[in-house]
Amino acid sequence: SYYHRAYEYDQGHLEGMLGLGRQLLRHEDLEASFKIYQNIQLQHLDRLYGEQAREVFFNAGVIKQRLGDRMRALDYFEKALDYDPEHKESINALLENYEATKEWDRYIDLTRQLLAVEQDPKIRFAKLSQIGDIYAEQIQDPGMAVQSYLEALSLEEQSVIILRKLLNLYTNTRQWVEAVDMLNRLIDLEPDDGKKSRFAYTIGVIYRDEVHDWQASVDAFDKALDADCHQLKAFEAIDRILTERKQWKELERAYRRMLKRVAEFKEEEKMGSLYMMLWQNLGEIYRSRLGHMQSAIQAYEMAASLSP
């Protein structure tokens, strides 16, 4: 070939050596190609400018990688980056190696290096999400995982996947205010009423058991019932909280709201029985808790009219 002839004519000619090294590498003559790149380093290193030096070290790294010498390959890829810090092929080659060797800190540093020059928001989102996964699952640093996921979320604010990952991290680290924020955002994005209700119920449990804010808890359980009145454990929770705190007027209002919700479904066997029981219990609240006898009578009469 032309490069072979040029090399035979002048074994120190830089352009000829570079061309021959490339050609041999393309033809998988790895040992011969590596020898050329070694000779370039010995003869011309002080004359190589950035792009040429990067090519020499990157290709030497590719050869060593294919020959199974991972450590030497890493050294060459790192040297290639010294001459061209934004060279994506060198960075990706290093990322592949650091992932295989589980050198996660270096992997993240290099990914951040790619992000510094990456403009595509979808690629940025994917890489930030990946960094978050590494911090969460490999390094087990929830704080840094949260930081990375929040960066990703700033690019795709409606990413349910990232919101759920943040919810899990906030829950595991007992950051309840932040967990509630994630749940509220999930509610806003969720089209299914049953799932909305379950998210709201979870908020109620957090306020009740972790934050110890009974009013916020009742409000959240109410939202769960507004989304799906079949979520009966939410109403049971409201009943229990308000009864324990002797909030009788609030309890009466809660029963009134529940009656209004259930009325729409009272033809269902289960909900019909519940509808009757709600009127009966409301009558008892009026009678024994609020002392409103006339209202109690009316509620009892309504319950009696529904009795089969």
Residue positions per predicted region:
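Repeat-based scaffolding regions
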Residues: S1-P308
